[in-house]
């Protein structure tokens, strides 16, 4: 009896029929010359999951598994053909594939958690050297030459919900304002995203935010809540405040005329306190502080993908090839997250990646395959019920 391998198991979360629909919409295979977007996707995901360090290693490793190519729907690859596709092919199909996987993860998260909290941040991706300089020099900053990856992370399961790839000189706030706002959700970000007009839009969308006031914020206190003796060791003050500056920047009118909340907390090991800003006027101060503390999860996410997936050493040197490789890293992370959830979520993502890396072309054992199908069927039933009754 035929049994699928681990690689096929992962790809089931992005069915080829769905992917080919994306390819058709973008007419991405128009000049493919026998090496289509699906071949490119499988090859690049193999590079991410196997940890291939170069195109030569990718070609040798992937082509050594020829008996599995038919069931993956691909043929042996040539590194020159893959390099050419990475340099020239529009990444729009891969962008849409990431969004499709994000939607699949988001549906599952909504069933598991009533309270949505998102973490927003960016991380630089350094690209230096003669082969990168011709397209990275003009947009470099004092700290970074390369690109910047912006991510909105779901705090419940540390999966990306939105992303953007820009030059490093693009302001975080400029990209942050493109994030879709969900009513009832909570958005946590640092003071680099300080913009009262944007805060007002989040408030108008009936969502919440937790961030930090800048040092020069002009505020006047409307109400001070008493600090209990039990909280005095960490909480300095809990106040409702209003913004005093009606023209904060460039003569623009500040639209945020409602009270905000300022929670000032001590930081262990630091001389300065943390001055938090939020439009949540009812939650305990301890919860507000804890929400901001969870922002570190997105720092760990960036550290994880840079350490364990391929976004520090690149297989191509063009802007297009680098962007495609970052997108396939995000796809690999999302596929691993979906597989982990289908298996009950008992393993760390690092342990699962280590197992996948060592057994990428191993056939699943019969009991494994059966239990995977059963769990996936149960997950589909839950999703259908949520669609019907939600």
Regions found by a protein language model. Name each.
Residues 65-68, 104, 311:
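A short structural micro-motif
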Residues 1-57, 87-89, 112-116, 120-131, ...:
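Single, function-defining residue in the core of a domain
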Residues 63, 81-82, 181:
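Acidic/polar active-site rim loop that often engages polyanionic ligands
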Residues 75-135:
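Active-site- or DNA-interface-adjacent structural scaffold in DNA-acting proteins
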Residues 54-72:
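DNA-recognition alpha helix
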């Amino acid at each position: 009896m035929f049994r699928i391998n681990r690689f096929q198991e992962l790809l089931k979360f992005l069915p080829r029929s769905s992917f080919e629909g994306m390819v058709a919409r973008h007419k991405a295979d128009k000049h493919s010359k026998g090496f289509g977007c699906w071949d490119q996707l499988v090859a690049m995901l193999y590079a991410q999951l196997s940890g291939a360090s170069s195109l030569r290693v990718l070609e040798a490793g992937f082509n050594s598994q020829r008996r599995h190519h038919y069931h993956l729907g691909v043929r042996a690859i040539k590194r020159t053909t893959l390099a050419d596709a990475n340099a020239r092919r529009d990444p729009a199909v891969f962008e849409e594939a990431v969004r499709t996987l994000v939607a699949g993860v988001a549906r599952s998260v909504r069933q598991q958690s009533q309270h949505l909290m998102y973490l927003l941040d960016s991380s630089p991706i350094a690209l230096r050297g003669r082969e990168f300089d011709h397209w990275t020099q003009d947009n470099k900053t004092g700290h970074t030459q390369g690109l910047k990856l912006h991510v909105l992370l779901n705090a419940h399961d540390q999966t990306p919900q939105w992303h953007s790839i820009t030059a490093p000189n693009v302001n975080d706030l400029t990209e942050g304002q493109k994030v879709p706002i969900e009513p009832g959700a909570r958005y946590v970000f640092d003071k680099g995203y300080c913009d009262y007009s944007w805060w007002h839009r989040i408030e108008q969308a009936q969502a919440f935010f937790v961030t930090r006031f800048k040092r020069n914020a002009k505020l006047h206190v409307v109400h001070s809540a008493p600090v209990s003796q039990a909280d005095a060791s960490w909480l300095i003050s809990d106040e409702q405040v209003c913004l005093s500056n009606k023209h904060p920047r460039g003569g623009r009118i500040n639209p945020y005329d409602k009270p905000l909340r300022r929670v000032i907390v001590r930081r262990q090991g630091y001389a300065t306190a943390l001055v938090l800003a939020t439009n949540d006027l009812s939650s305990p101060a301890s919860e507000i502080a804890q929400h901001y503390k969870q922002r570190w999860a997105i720092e760990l996410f960036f550290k994880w993908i840079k350490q364990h997936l391929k976004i520090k050493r690149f297989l191509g040197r063009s802007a297009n090839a680098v962007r495609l490789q970052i997108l396939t890293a995000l796809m690999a992370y999302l596929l691993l997250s979906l597989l982990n959830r289908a298996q009950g979520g008992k393993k760390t993502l690092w342990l699962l990646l280590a197992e996948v890396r060592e057994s990428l072309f191993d056939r699943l054992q019969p009991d494994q395959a059966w239990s995977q199908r059963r769990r996936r069927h149960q997950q589909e039933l839950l999703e259908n019920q949520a669609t019907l009754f939600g």
